[in-house]
Amino acid sequence: MKFNPILIVAGEPNSVFLEIFFKSINNKKIKNPIILIASLKLLELQMSKLKVNKKVNIIVNKNLKQNKIFKNKINLINVNYSPKKPFEKISSKSNNYISNCFKLAFEIIKKNKIKKFINGPINKKTFLNKNYLGITEYISKKLKIKKTAMLIYNKELSVSPLTTHLPLKYVAKKIN
């Protein structure tokens, strides 16, 4: 069987992303193993608060093929972050953690030739700090990708906008 995992960066630790993740991991439509990059401590705190009972498989080797990956467990690459509570107010305190998660993800994507990547939400004001229009541009720059697309997906519809985060006055120039 071809090794083709989905790599997920949880993003802002104080968002609802992990709650959504916990609800989606048992979806039968997901055929590929999922590998989550997040904090084990945060994961355990939020699992306890949300009463989620799922085993966690810690992945230690960045060469993913050398690890056991399970479909029935949360495959986690731990990034150090020490919250005191499961949910706190969103602030710039989590920027270093988010940055470390993305750096690790980019390294793993390059090393393992990962083709499926999902990122959780981030706060543009605190994390991107006006250096990038959005997370799509941040990821593109870090991975040195010139042509990118966002995919917005739900049960009813999948949409890929013609442009990414772009002020309206520049849209016409970008699509010509």
How does the language model describe each region?
Residues M1-N176:
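Anion-binding alpha/beta catalytic cores of soluble intermediary-metabolism enzymes, centered on
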